[in-house]
Amino acid sequence: MTHDNKLQVEAIKCGTVIDHIPAQVGFKLLSLFKLTETDQRITIGLNLPSGEMGRKDLIKIENTFLTEEQVNQLALYAPQATVNRIDNYDVVGKSRPSLPERINNVLVCPNSNCISHAEPVSSSFAVKKRANDIALKCKYCEKEFSHYVVLAN
């Protein structure tokens, strides 16, 4: 019996690979982090087989590199993600997201009365780790929400 271990998503020469994204989360990351606002080629793998996770999503962005802040903001959505820097088809850097103190310009406050909905301000949430949850506190209305509530928003 032979095992066919071919790449299911084409390799990139230079850029960023976000691997080990939980299945069904890849599109949300593309949208929230505005990863599609580029002229560079983006390759997306959805529901790919994974030994560790069963199924996973994968995003490859050519000629684009994420900042440390961007990598860490992934922690809410994909805490087990691996972010690889690729140069000349080789992995030259590898990092994992760690929960940041703040998340800016990504999330929308679930409080419909929050001033952030009516004014041209950038969203900003303080991140607080709780026993079984992560709480996000809006900078403007100062209300605190479970991260699940904010992510579903």
From Swiss-Prot:
It holds the Pfam family PyrI. The keyword Mitochondrion does not apply. One of its GO terms (biological process) is 'de novo' pyrimidine nucleobase biosynthetic process. GO terms for molecular function: metal ion binding. Zn(2+) binds at C109, C114, C138, C141. One of its GO terms (cellular component) is aspartate carbamoyltransferase complex. Heterododecamer (2C3:3R2) of six catalytic PyrB chains organized as two trimers (C3), and six regulatory PyrI chains organized as three dimers (R2). Belongs to the PyrI family. Involved in allosteric regulation of aspartate carbamoyltransferase. This is Aspartate carbamoyltransferase regulatory chain. It comes from Salmonella typhimurium (strain LT2 / SGSC1412 / ATCC 700720). The lineage of its organism: Bacteria, Pseudomonadati, Pseudomonadota, Gammaproteobacteria, Enterobacterales.
